[in-house]
């Protein structure tokens, strides 16, 4: 409920970067006078608040934390060029799963760039690392990278996947690698 005397602010934008990819050209917006009609929530029997039953859940996974998670969200503006970047760095930590001994960890790095005056400058890049190991020396790691940019006609994407396994002698060896590129027509997007 909106308390008496409070106001709602309606924000209208032609961009929702980086959640939605921008159109190839800046889109104009023309607003004329209008109204906003919001539904009124009916009162319940005892109050004007909703109450829900507790959620059903399974037994939590029993794990021992080896390295805590750490997350960074950072915006950067290149003062020379005006390029705006969103940098996301997620270290999800490392845990030992007590029931079966798997040691698991992962990190994710993302970068989303755009120049505010040039929607076609948008580009994104992500790099995910997943590690799994056991106390007996067995270990595997995957590296997944992908990126995207666009021109006025097409979206251009690339992806790369690599997998590594640690040999019994302790040496890590690449056991898989693939790289692909695609171009997809924008079809007025």
Regions inferred by a protein language model and the residue ranges of each:
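Glycine/threonine-rich phosphate-binding loop and adjacent beta-strand/alpha-helix elements that clamp
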Residues: 1-189
């Amino acid at each position: 409920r909106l308390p008496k005397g409070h106001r709602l602010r309606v924000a209208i934008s032609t961009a929702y970067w980086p959640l939605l990819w921008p159109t190839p050209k800046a889109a104009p917006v023309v607003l004329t006078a209008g109204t906003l009609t919001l539904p009124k929530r009916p009162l319940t029997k005892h109050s004007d608040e909703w109450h829900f039953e507790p959620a059903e859940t399974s037994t939590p996974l029993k794990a021992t934390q080896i390295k805590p998670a750490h997350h960074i969200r950072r915006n950067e503006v290149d003062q020379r060029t005006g390029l705006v970047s969103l940098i996301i760095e997620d270290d999800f930590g490392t845990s030992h799963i007590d029931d079966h001994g798997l040691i698991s960890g992962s990190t994710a790095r993302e970068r989303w760039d755009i120049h505010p005056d040039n929607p076609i400058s948008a580009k994104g890049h992500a790099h995910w690392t997943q590690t799994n190991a056991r106390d007996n020396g067995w270990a595997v790691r995957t590296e997944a990278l992908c990126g995207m940019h666009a021109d006025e006609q097409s979206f251009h994407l690339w992806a790369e996947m690599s997998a590594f396994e640690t040999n019994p002698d302790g040496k890590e060896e690449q056991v898989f690698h693939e790289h692909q590129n695609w171009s997809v027509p924008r079809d007025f997007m």
